């Protein structure tokens, strides 16, 4: 009897793992894998692809970023439409977003295409809010993603796209993304303070 219960527990545990590895979560995993690939191409392109014109490397990196960004839209859409939201997905999706954006900004900064101050501000905000959300969760405060947070992500993606392609206006879009990134970060802090006052 004990052996049978243990066996059923193991099967149910494995089933839970496979249920968590649904299509939206696999897309998030795919996005996580694309982030270091894009960073590697940006930083090492001049040394590795010596026979290919450097502008083609920009296109390759931009293509990787676009593919990753598209999967970001689809994993959320599929999770909502097919009722495939999981706890694993709630962790993987924002993690993949941050890895993709930060890998792109760091690579662009190292190439001299993105202001170091702008990148540092985005980095500090992302890491601070990630840690702050852990504190919020420990205090039982749950804040849903705001419209400012969604607009922030879109603005970051546009800034990265323009900077990758070296198009005019990339630096302006970067600083707009910085402003929205900081604003959405303050929203989390104000929401936490408001929730704690109510409690």
Outline where the language-model segments fall.
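Alpha-helical transmembrane bundles and membrane-interface segments of multipass inner-membrane proteins
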Residues: 2-199
């Amino acid at each position: 009897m004990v052996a049978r219960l243990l066996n059923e527990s193991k099967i149910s545990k494995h089933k839970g793992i496979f249920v968590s590895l649904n299509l939206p979560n696999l897309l998030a995993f795919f996005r996580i894998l694309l982030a270091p690939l894009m960073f590697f191409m940006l930083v090492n392109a001049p040394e590795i692809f010596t026979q290919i014109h450097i502008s083609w490397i920009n296109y390759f990196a931009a293509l990787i970023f676009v593919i990753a960004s598209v999967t970001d839209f689809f994993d959320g859409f599929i999770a909502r439409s097919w009722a495939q939201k999981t706890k694993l997905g709630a962790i993987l999706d924002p993690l993949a977003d941050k890895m993709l954006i930060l890998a792109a900004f760091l690579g662009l900064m190292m190439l001299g295409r993105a202001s170091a101050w702008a990148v540092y501000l985005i980095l500090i905000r992302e890491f601070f809010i990630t840690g702050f959300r852990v504190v919020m969760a420990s205090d039982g405060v749950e804040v849903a993603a705001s419209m400012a947070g969604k607009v922030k992500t879109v603005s970051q993606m546009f800034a990265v796209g323009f900077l990758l392609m070296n198009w005019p206006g990339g630096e302006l879009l970067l600083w707009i993304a910085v402003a929205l990134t900081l604003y959405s970060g303050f929203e989390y802090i104000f929401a936490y303070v408001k929730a704690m006052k109510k409690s």
